[in-house]
């Protein structure tokens, strides 16, 4: 089963992705989805069983509890994930960014999910001087047309991984940073 096979599997993968690498998520999700590719199956699992599958993921104990509770909440709400911000953000372990990824990637609804990586890049590139991800999301939504938000979110992530990593960042390696820093120096009169 692929992570993007359903809104549910996408939601689970995004919930697992916090504080860990995509590589780790991609390693554990096939085993998890073999046993629990629906909220109904996840709700039937014991927290300890979920934890044993995802133990290599950061914050695994909390995520295991949240996955079970989230599945139970979905069942109590009709059994399916709906494209509804309030519903998604009411689920255990689901914040605004996770809800945004599901809204944009599973349902095609314009959203601009901002995590710490996009927040850092938007600041480096001069697209936002936001002190938090909510302000950065607001700024990016003003910079980019709404019909581009879903793909811009992904483009920023992939571009950042390739040219503008958090660690070992070299201004000369990132075309945007080299341009943005030159623009900033000109503005500051250097």
What does each of the following model-derived ranges do?
Residues 4-190:
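Catalytic cores of DNA base-excision repair glycosylases
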